[in-house]
Amino acid sequence: MPRRTATLEDVARRGRVPADGLRRVLNRPEVVSARTREQVIRAMQALHYVPNRSAQLLAGKAAPSIGLITASVTLHAPSQIAAAIKSHASLHQLEVAIAMPAQADFVALQARLDELRAQHIRGVIVSLPLESATAERLVQDNPDMACLFLDVSPEADVCCVRFDHRDGCGACVRHLWEMGHREFGLLAGPESSVSARLRLASWREALHSLNIARSTTVFGDWSAASGWQKTFELLHLQPRISAIVVANDQMALGVLSALAQLNRSGSQAVSVTGYDDTADSLYFQPPLTTVAQDFDLLGKRAVERLIALMAAPQLRIRELLPTRLIVRQSAWPVAAAEDRQQTLAQLKALVEKL
């Protein structure tokens, strides 16, 4: 007969520690006496309790770890960043403990930092858009924790590695302008998002530099569904829009779907650009013109800079990574759309003559 797997309750009885007390021991080992810690470890060993993360920490046998506080990995960009960080951390024999707060406010973030601290983690990468004041307070209130931020404004007085939003957004706008577009729709991310506001400001700055004073702006929530919905809103607000600049690839997917549903082709065709160059964007219909952010490079730099910061907390790390415009088939010259419509009309006339 197979042996029953030992539970935490079994360990508590064997070690003569109350069940609630045992859970506190596992969650906060640094506040437990050496005698109690040894008592719990002996009970786990006697019962052949399957070592989990907490037991390893108690025994001091866990692999060195860093923390990653990130937005939901159901979104493509955060999931790719998390994968890159884990991959490069493993090259340094580091494990990555991931925390995903429901909100990006100070209280929620501090709670996640406390959980990571309880796992003996002393270095954290924060990969979600944060207000400058929130990021700065996290650093000030946690002097024992090395914090590196990936999505803060240029004004934030914290250590960061981030992409150059201004360069990428400007490249998109200039590319469309060079193809004759003058009526722009701007589909931004949530107004509460720092990165969304930075991209929107960069688009508007680029449009202003090209003497385009008017554009129509709506705000989505990063999802394809919101991209689909907001396309109808944009075209209702300004039917003459010839190009829609979108703050991420997932919303751009929704935009392309809505335009296909509206049969916006020929002289009514609307060019679309995205942002992120996620793995799927090449296979959108049509393939998406977008701004590439090298997430693998971001993961590599983030891990390297966090290791350096943990070794020398006095370092001031502020690194800006380049972006790159990827030109595909979702954006075309205004004249080209009109030419296609004329070609179709000519072909139709020829067919009717046959």
From Swiss-Prot:
Keywords: DNA-binding, Repressor, Transcription, Transcription regulation. One of its GO terms (molecular function) is DNA-binding transcription factor activity. Residues 6-60 form the HTH lacI-type domain. Gene3D superfamilies: 3.40.50.2300, lambda repressor-like DNA-binding domains. InterPro entries: HTH_LacI (IPR000843), LacI/GalR-like_sensor (IPR046335), Lambda_DNA-bd_dom_sf (IPR010982), Peripla_BP_I (IPR028082). Residues 8-27 bind DNA. It holds the Pfam family LacI. Transmembrane segments: none annotated. It comes from the Bacteria. Repressor of the lactose operon. Binds lactose as an inducer. Homotetramer. This is Lactose operon repressor. It comes from Klebsiella pneumoniae. The gene is lacI.
